[in-house]
Amino acid sequence: MLAHIHDIPSCNLIEGYDAQFIHTAQATYSHVKAKAGAVLPKHSHPQEQVSYILEGKFELTVEDVPYELSPGQVFVIPSNALHSGRAITDCFILDVFTPMREDYREKGGIQLG
C-alpha cells in the first residue's frame, strides 16, 4: 500500500504538537511537528516507542533522566516508562509505536495494511 505524507490529515495532539498518523496492523507511525518551547507532560503507555529526530533539538526525559536529542539521533522508550519532553527548537520527529496505539487511531490518520 502506498501513501504520500502530504495526503495524510494532521491533528492537534496537545498545545504545540501536531501529528500525522499512519496505522498498520502492528504499529502506529506518528510524524510530529513540535513548536519551540512546547511541553509534553509526563506520561507512559504500554507501547514501546522509537523516536527519530528529523529536525530540531528536543529534550526527552525518561525515568527522570534528561537527554538532549538532535537530528539523526534515535531513542527507544521502553514500554510503560515514564517520560516527558520539551521542544528546544521547532522540531520534526518520527515516532513509531508497537503495538499500534488505538488512542491515536481514534484521532485519525490513515490505515495501511
Regions picked out by a protein language model, each given a short descriptive name:
Residues 30-44:
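Conserved short histidine dyad/triad with adjacent acidic residue
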Residues 28, 57-59, 66, 82, ...:
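Structural motif
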Residues 1-26, 109-113:
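A short, N-terminal "cap"/entry segment at the start of jelly-roll beta-barrel domains
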Residues 48-58, 63:
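Glycine- and acidic-residue-biased ligand/ion/polar-headgroup-sensing regions
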Residues 54-55, 70-71, 89:
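A cytosolic small-molecule/anion-sensing beta-strand core signal
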Residues 64-79:
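Short acidic-glycine-tyrosine-enriched beta hairpin
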Residues 79-103:
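Ligand-binding loop in jelly-roll beta-barrel domains
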